[in-house]
Amino acid sequence: MKIALVGPGIMEIPPKGWGAVESLIWDYATELGELGHEGTIINTPDRTQIIRELSEEKYDFIHVHYDVFYDIMDYIHKACPDAKLAISSHYPYIDQPDRHPYDGYDKIYKWLIENDKYYNFCISYKDYETYKRDSANVDKLLVCPNGAQHRDYHFTEKPLKPSWTLYLGRIEPRKRQYLYQDIYGVEFVGKYTDTTSFDRNRDCYLGQWEHEYKLQHVTDYGLSLIHI
């Protein structure tokens, strides 16, 4: 199959550091290739360019990984009438409707609920149940949980820090790293955002790792928690 994966166009794919969605899209394309399919990444914020690039090839399936592009789904369908279309929302607060207006997500969510043309690949069962609760068309809802490309990670049976835990993820209120910072034996890695009481000056915060370094060293620990 010939499959197009549409990214946000905010940062490069694959990312050099933090970029959970971008890493996921890269892993999808890599895995599709290993399975004998052709996974093409289109990664630009320019809606016109997205439609143009999609129309230049004959795709069997198009998966849009940025919910902000909901407003061009009909245009994509018109440009690629033979392709199956799906969209995924990676918004972390789908199940918290009180947050939607503050993040500009209310219009996007309304469209996702009312959509009955294109598949909605939910990245978690939590999101699936939220859509279902709000009367989305269940025939268009499919659960496709996020995962990690395990083959890229260095594996060892004897980690360097067997009694230590690594918490890997962007430092932000949603992930609540600040609650665990006083626990001995836990180290934190991730892009710091100045929106949380997490203290980045403490020794347990190791900063942000480059992607390749992360692949080599995330298994240095007895337990690694990757929070995307």
Each language-model region and where it sits:
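Conserved small/polar residues in nucleotide/adenosyl-binding loops
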Residues: 226-228
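Active-site proximal beta-strand in glycosyltransferases
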Residues: 3-4, 61-63, 76-96, 121
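Acidic anion/phosphate-binding donor-loop and adjacent secondary structure
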Residues: 97-100, 143-163, 198
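Short N-terminal targeting/anchoring amphipathic segment
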Residues: 53-70, 84-86
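Conserved active-site histidine-acidic residue motif and adjacent donor-binding/catalytic loop
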Residues: 171, 192, 199-222
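Conserved donor-binding/catalytic core segment of Leloir-type glycosyltransferases
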Residues: 121, 157-187
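Donor nucleotide-sugar binding/catalytic pocket of nucleotide-sugar-dependent glycosyltransferases
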Residues: 116-132, 136-154
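Membrane-proximal helix-turn-helix segments that form the acceptor-binding/catalytic region
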Residues: 101-120
